[in-house]
Design a protein with these regions (language model features):
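N-terminal signal-anchor transmembrane alpha helix
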Residues: 1-39
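Aromatic-anchored segments of alpha-helical transmembrane domains
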Residues: 9-15, 122-132
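Long, glycine/tryptophan/cysteine-rich extracytoplasmic
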Residues: 30-65
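Individual transmembrane alpha-helix segments
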Residues: 57-94
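Hydrophobic cores of alpha-helical transmembrane segments in multi-pass inner/ER membrane proteins
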Residues: 96-97, 154-168
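Membrane-interface helix-boundary motifs at transmembrane edges
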Residues: 103-114, 171-174
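Juxtamembrane "helix-exit" motif on the non-cytosolic side of transmembrane helices
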Residues: 104-106, 130-142
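Non-cytosolic membrane-interface motifs at loop->transmembrane helix junctions
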Residues: 140-153
Length: 174
């Protein structure tokens, strides 16, 4: 039981950090084009420019905290690559956490194949939706959908849905 509790705490902490990281990356990527010569500025100048813009813009409920300062060392391409890397690493880490929790809760590893299939299907769906949006020149609309799908996979949502489903299936089969 202690291990389950530890995994849940780790998942919550990692979830908050990866979300803060991606929000900061997105905020910089979205606002940098509004600042002349942004990527030519040094780290402190980038930070000051973004923060000055944040204080003059309407309140952003999604990004109401200061960005992670170490991100200002990166250029646009590095930020884009980091965003994708964080997405893939988070998917993998949360798959391992969800798989570990299911293994501990169920006591067998047969459910892990099903969980892997669920992750594969929904990850493929999310990236297909995003790709179609890019091809149809409407990436903002499809990004929001794919972000919600991958966001659910980068959390404890899979185990919160899958484990009760497994328990109900066992009860119905007995």
């Amino acid at each position: 039981m202690l291990l389950i509790g530890c995994l849940v705490v780790v998942a919550i902490a990692l979830g908050f950090y990866q979300e803060q990281l991606k929000i900061s990356i997105n905020y910089i990527l979205e606002n940098a084009p509004r600042i002349a010569g942004f990527y030519g500025l040094n780290e402190e100048q980038k930070h000051q420019a973004i923060e000055a813009q944040r204080f003059t813009a309407p309140f952003d409920y999604y990004h109401s905290h200061e960005t992670l300062r170490w991100l200002y060392k990166m250029n646009e391409l590095q930020l884009l690559r980091l965003k994708w890397a964080v997405t893939f690493v988070s998917l993998l880490v949360f798959f391992v956490i969800n798989a570990s929790l299911l293994r501990l809760l169920e006591g067998n590893s047969r459910v892990l194949t099903r969980l892997a299939l669920i992750y594969l299907i929904f990850t493929t769906l999310a990236f297909a939706i995003y790709a179609v949006g890019k091809l149809m020149s409407m990436p903002d609309q499809t990004y929001a959908i794919s972000r919600r799908i991958t966001g659910a996979l980068q959390s404890l949502v899979p185990v919160m849905i899958f484990w009760p489903f497994l328990r109900l299936s066992k009860q119905n089969n007995t």
